[in-house]
Amino acid sequence: MKIIHISDLHLNTYFKNSHLEEIKFILNFIAKENFDHLIISGDLTDNADSQDFEILRDLFKRKDLLRGDRLSLMIGNHDVYGGIVTPNDIFTFHEKCEKINYHLRLNEFYLYFFETFENCAYRNDYYPYAKKFGDLLIVAMNSVMPYSKVRNPFASNGSVNLEQYNEVIKILEEFSSVKRKLIFTHHHFNKIKSLRTGGLYNVWNNIEKQTIKLKKKKRLFNMLRKYNVDLVLHGHYHKSEEYYRKGIRFLNAGATIKDSPRKTIRINIIEISKEKISVDIKKLDLNSHRGVYYPVNKTITGPEYPRIILQ
């Protein structure tokens, strides 16, 4: 089975550098690949804006990806709380987060892409859910933590609450006979370093990097080892790499677009056979692999947001 893994698309059509061109390029490239399933591990949007979700839904539909057997999605912290769009947002972000209904945002994300949540072997509300493909089990585990002034002041920390943790265990026990087990979530499990450059935006990034930790990792490590999970996919930290921690294999797709060199795309390709799971982090030059893009017209529908219409 061939799985393509991408993450952190951060679509934001408020800005000229919206990542829309890169996302269309990625989907065109994927469409030409002989793949079985696509996994996107969170932060599909940058600011949780409704028009960005609508654009992504349309792009997925055009590529026949709005199907549970073709696409699995994870919500990211930016899909719930958004992020820092302008320098002034640094001073108003906390107030914005306090007004957001976490559970409502989970429901809205589900409704935008509800077709991809169908044909599950297990699903309770939104997360966790599981899909079974022959001798492969894919489990989706939500790590986005509700906003808290004390425990999650920048809405970027992660946590898997006890209820969901127990449900994941239930899934792994119910499908214990399945040979290959893959879990995907949004938050990373590795340690990261701070930026040394200056500037207000990078100061914010350094603050955020100190508050993007996945809490209570110890019990997650124990669970992953106990149930012999073969591979854990994630994003959040904008780096594409394969690594091991506590004897567990991880694959990050956080630099699919973000923090990659200009016009460079990174796509994780996973090949699963009876004998092994192989991983290839494919680097693509956007300029030398250009495909056919959808025509895009921009029209203004309000005082703040340009509306992008796909024809």
What residues fall within each predicted segment?
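Extended active-site neighborhood of metal-dependent phosphoesterases/phosphodiesterases
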Residues: 55-167, 175, 225, 269
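Active-site environment of divalent metal-dependent phosphoester hydrolases
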Residues: 10-15, 45-50, 74-88, 127, ...
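Conserved beta-sheet core of the metallophosphoesterase superfamily
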Residues: 61, 197-275
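Active-site-proximal beta-strand elements of phosphoester/diester hydrolases
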Residues: 1-13, 135-149, 184, 249-255
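Active-site-proximal segments of metal-dependent phosphoesterases and phosphodiesterases across multiple
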Residues: 147-159, 175-228
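N-terminal active-site segment of His-dependent metallophosphoesterases
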Residues: 1-58
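Active-site neighborhood of phospho(di)ester-bond hydrolases with catalytic His/Asp-centered motifs
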Residues: 5-7, 38-43, 70-77, 142, ...
